[in-house]
Amino acid sequence: MAVLKKPDLSDPKLRAKLAKGMGHNYYGEPAWPNDLLYVFPVVIMGTIGLVVGLAVLDPGMIGEPADPFATPLEILPEWYLYPVFQILRILPNKLLGIACQAAIPLGLMLIPFIESVNKFQNPFRRPVATTFFMIGTLVTLWLGAGAIFPIDKSLTLGLF
């Protein structure tokens, strides 16, 4: 059984359709320039107009309105800076905190040299890199979660 069916050009009905410009070689208007120059920009501008219209008609409030006369108890950075903030907060010396943050990329640059004898790309066959990645991910999550707690509960995450 064939997957493709070839047209029977000896069929008079098919030959009549092909003579009129109908059939497998006629699909309507060409994509260039009609669709690409006229229809697509209209769709894109319509989408942008819809998004802007929804943003103007129903603006989403982000958090509570700012009160310039009330200072918050603790000012926190954006969520993606929580681990860095926690390192600076828990280390007693600020220079030590900056040195620890500079040591992280330097340590990551050493991993390929430590594991240079292993040429595999599969992470399960590269135990040193996988171990560093897993420990680094867990420590980063732990530091990020601890940044939202008060300083006395930040290292234990309020569990102990």
UniProtKB/Swiss-Prot annotation:
<keyword id="KW-0793">Thylakoid</keyword>
<keyword id="KW-0813">Transport</keyword>
<keyword id="KW-0472">Membrane</keyword>
<feature type="transmembrane region" description="Helical">
    <location>
        <begin position="131"/>
        <end position="151"/>
    </location>
</feature>
<protein>
    <recommendedName>
        <fullName>Cytochrome b6-f complex subunit 4</fullName>
    </recommendedName>
</protein>
<dbReference type="Pfam" id="PF00032">
    <property type="entry name" value="Cytochrom_B_C"/>
</dbReference>
<dbReference type="GO" id="GO:0031676">
    <property type="term" value="C:plasma membrane-derived thylakoid membrane"/>
</dbReference>
<feature type="transmembrane region" description="Helical">
    <location>
        <begin position="95"/>
        <end position="115"/>
    </location>
</feature>
<keyword id="KW-1133">Transmembrane helix</keyword>
<keyword id="KW-0602">Photosynthesis</keyword>
<keyword id="KW-0249">Electron transport</keyword>
<dbReference type="InterPro" id="IPR036150">
    <property type="entry name" value="Cyt_b/b6_C_sf"/>
</dbReference>
<dbReference type="GO" id="GO:0045158">
    <property type="term" value="F:electron transporter, transferring electrons within cytochrome b6/f complex of photosystem II activity"/>
</dbReference>
<dbReference type="GO" id="GO:0009767">
    <property type="term" value="P:photosynthetic electron transport chain"/>
</dbReference>
<dbReference type="InterPro" id="IPR005798">
    <property type="entry name" value="Cyt_b/b6_C"/>
</dbReference>
<dbReference type="GO" id="GO:0045156">
    <property type="term" value="F:electron transporter, transferring electrons within the cyclic electron transport pathway of photosynthesis activity"/>
</dbReference>
<dbReference type="GO" id="GO:0016491">
    <property type="term" value="F:oxidoreductase activity"/>
</dbReference>
<keyword id="KW-0812">Transmembrane</keyword>
<comment type="similarity">
    <text>Belongs to the cytochrome b family. PetD subfamily.</text>
</comment>
<feature type="transmembrane region" description="Helical">
    <location>
        <begin position="36"/>
        <end position="56"/>
    </location>
</feature>
<dbReference type="InterPro" id="IPR005870">
    <property type="entry name" value="Cyt_b6/f_cplx_suIV"/>
</dbReference>
<dbReference type="InterPro" id="IPR048260">
    <property type="entry name" value="Cytochrome_b_C_euk/bac"/>
</dbReference>
<comment type="subunit">
    <text>The 4 large subunits of the cytochrome b6-f complex are cytochrome b6, subunit IV (17 kDa polypeptide, PetD), cytochrome f and the Rieske protein, while the 4 small subunits are PetG, PetL, PetM and PetN. The complex functions as a dimer.</text>
</comment>
<comment type="function">
    <text>Component of the cytochrome b6-f complex, which mediates electron transfer between photosystem II (PSII) and photosystem I (PSI), cyclic electron flow around PSI, and state transitions.</text>
</comment>
